[in-house]
Regions:
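Membrane-cytosol interface segments of multi-pass membrane proteins
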Residues: 1-163, 167
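Aromatic-enriched alpha-helical transmembrane segments of multi-pass intramembrane proteins
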Residues: 113-115, 139-224
Length: 224
């Protein structure tokens, strides 16, 4: 028996894709260069407020669809991230051809490890990080005794950026520089629990959806 297609989830995906296109489309119509108050600026701001939820929608969907699955950290589970990393490296090499021609090899490697060597690579970095954390998140969600080990791993993962992002590969005097000049070994959005929060919202919705279905079944049984 094949999987049942969920029209509501497909609809959310469609809206999320349209919102992504809309967010980036605003930069092409000159929205970010507008400064004087006008109807155009107001309308663009209103559109941006609505469509900026594009990434959160994808993260919530990920939590909804993945929270109740059992994942094991194995070579097979890690195959997908390695394939995506290979694609990223190829794209980064192509996008960095002008840098190579100027002899900027060092800046290329810095950008590569910061996921800035290709346009919008931050999104890939975020999803890869979330993908690697899903087994721990799901264990934490399913655990009935508090999931002590999972909590420790989560705390470790979200505090690592603060500890490791205080160096600057472009200067030997990194210790005396500002945080804005630091190189990011781990993206800052992990400090804010941004992806985890939306994943948990999706997991919460899935759990309540399952509970609602159980209540419906119980109600039908009682009626019969």
């Amino acid at each position: 028996m094949g999987k049942i297609k969920r029209a509501d989830l497909d609809l959310i995906r469609c809206f999320a894709i349209i919102f992504v296109i809309s967010v980036h489309g605003l930069s092409y119509v000159g929205f970010y260069e507008l400064s004087n108050p006008s109807i155009t600026l107001f309308v663009c701001h209103l559109i941006r407020v609505i469509v900026i939820i594009c990434v959160p929608l994808f993260l919530i969907l990920t939590g909804y669809l993945s929270a109740e699955k059992e994942y094991i950290l194995s070579f097979k589970y890690l195959e997908k991230p390695f394939r995506l990393l290979a694609i990223y490296i190829v794209c980064a090499l192509i996008c960095s051809i002008p840098q190579f021609m100027r002899g900027e090899i060092k800046s290329f490697f810095v950008a590569l490890f910061e996921f800035k060597a290709a346009p919008y690579a931050w999104y890939l970095a975020m999803y890869l990080g979330l993908y690697l954390m899903i087994p721990f998140l799901n264990e934490f969600i399913a655990s009935k005794n508090g999931g002590g080990k999972s909590i420790f791993v989560l705390i470790l993962l979200v505090t690592l950026p603060t500890v490791t992002n205080n160096c600057n590969f472009n200067s030997f005097e990194w210790w005396n520089g500002s945080k804005e000049q630091s190189s990011q070994l781990f993206p800052n959005y992990w400090d804010e629990l941004y992806p985890i929060m939306y994943y948990m919202i999706g997991a919460f919705l899935k759990r309540n959806d399952a509970m609602a279905n159980k209540l419906k079944k119980i109600t039908l049984i009682i009626k019969h």
